[in-house]
Amino acid sequence: LYFLFQRCQQLGALNQQDLFAQVRVSDYLLEKDRLFARVTLDDAEFGLYEQIYAKLDVQAPKPDLVIYLQAPVDVLLERIAGRGIGYEQYIERDYLVRLNEAYARFFHEFEGAPLLIVNAAAIDPINNPADYDELLAAIRRMKRGRLYYNPLRSKDPFSKR
């Protein structure tokens, strides 16, 4: 519930910002909060979450583009270990499996905005400038609908490089 209220506060502030801003980048959708709640909370807690969410009048701006970075759990675990962020080291594999499945189901049916689904296992835009440039080009090409971005150099769509 803390995260839900925090997101609502952030969205309220976002709605108050300059209406003429050209670009706003966010690393979440409000719907993402519900995914985490469903995976994390037991049934009774999730029921309470749903009741509170239904009472909130959340006016989230519609995104121009949503980017879903998709990767297998093994790749996610490697990246978590490599980042070395303390609290992330305690994330359990089972939790990631459930969360990954929830994301896949959600984005399979998502129609709220243009959607770019990125095979994030095949690229490293943080450490590889060419990957960054190619991903940025794919983002700029994205106008509507749904696009699956899978770099051609990847023989196996979920291979590790």
Model-derived features with residue positions:
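ATP-dependent small-molecule kinase phosphotransfer cores
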Residues: 1-51
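Generic, ordered loop/turn and secondary-structure boundary motif
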Residues: 4, 12, 36-37, 92, ...
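Conserved catalytic network of the ASCE P-loop NTPase/AAA+ motor domain
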Residues: 13-19, 57-62, 110
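Hydrophobic/aromatic beta-strand patches that form the interior of the parallel beta-sheet core
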Residues: 26, 65-67, 116-118
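Short, internal active-site loops enriched in acidic
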Residues: 29-31, 71-74, 120-125
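A glycine- and Lys/Arg-enriched "phosphate-lid" helix/loop adjacent to the NTP-binding pocket
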Residues: 33-104
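NTP-dependent small-molecule kinase module
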Residues: 81-87, 95-161
